[in-house]
Amino acid sequence: YGSELLGSRLGEIPGTLGAQLSSENINEDLYKGFEIVIGHRNKINDFNYSVNLNFALTRHLNRFIVESDAVNSYDRWRNKYSNRYTDMGWTYGSNGQFTSMNDIWHSPIQDGQGGATQLPGDWKYEDWNGDGIIDSNDVYPNAYEHMGDNGNPKMTFGAAISAEWKGFDVSLLFQGGGGFNVIYFEQLQYPLCFGGNGLAHFYDRYRQDESGNWIPGKWPTTRDAGSYSVNYARCKQTTYDASYLRLKSMEIGYTIPKNLTRKFKVDRLRIFASGYNLFTLSNLDFVDPEHPEGNYGYLYPIMRNFNFGLNLAF
């Protein structure tokens, strides 16, 4: 529980004041959660092993934030943050893709320009409130995002496993996260963003043949930068479950028997091979699931490393 956090009362007063207010110690937040750690080790003749498991669940609650009063129940639900968890993701719902211009003409307008910028293959957003118009009033909470600004998933878990047998040893470290989504709307809806390259996903996009007929694809068609606003929104189609399990490290070694090493005046000799970030199980196949969406996924991928070596003791 945290109290007297910095905040400004600017949200409580009309914008006509035309002045900035200094920060005060007025906001409050609360972290809720638990952690479980289980360990076991045993020896069976020459075989030694140990297993350690951990699991944690944490949620962050804005217990109190200085903000203006809600004008109605919808405003309170959509725009206010006091007494609300920080990991709620608001997006448009999914109605698939537009399959033709006729489909666009007979669907609610969603580009604010009478459909002038819409093309077959564009995402078809859900008219969630049923008013016949696709706008900001149609977004709703349907995802668990990275919590706040720290990029932590709601659930974390891991396992450390080690074993030894007649000079051989092995150790493994697994880590994972779950119960959260990422929404990489920039890469998936603006494939040539800022003049950069697009993801390989867009080889399978809606496109026209030489006769002008539309060929269906999994992703929207590409176009010049000025026409991307129709797809440049957070939507269910670009929301991914980022749960993952990663083999973070693994090491295999063998210790040479002392009756052999002492002939060379070596007290202990162990050879080993190790690897880091060996594999990841995840629904995300185009970006690392640990990359927070706040950076739009624009980070260098993690490195897979392999090491070989020996430990000597004289």
Where are these regions (language model features)?
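Transmembrane beta-strands of outer-membrane beta-barrel pores
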Residues: 1-4, 40-42, 55-61, 165-167, ...
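Membrane-embedded beta-barrel scaffold of Gram-negative outer-membrane proteins
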Residues: 1-17, 47-49, 56, 60
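C-terminal beta-signal and terminal closure region of outer-membrane beta-barrel proteins
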Residues: 14-15, 22-31, 73-99, 209-213, ...
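Transmembrane beta-barrel architecture of outer-membrane proteins
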Residues: 21, 30-35, 48, 154-158, ...
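Conserved small-residue
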Residues: 27-29, 43-150, 189-191, 207-212
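Membrane-embedded beta-strand positions of outer-membrane beta-barrel proteins
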Residues: 38, 51-53, 172, 271-273, ...
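Repeated loop/turn-to-beta-strand initiation elements of outer-membrane beta-barrel proteins
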Residues: 45-47, 167-171, 259-260
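Extracytoplasmic gating/loop element in the C-terminal half of outer-membrane beta-barrel translocons
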Residues: 177-270, 275
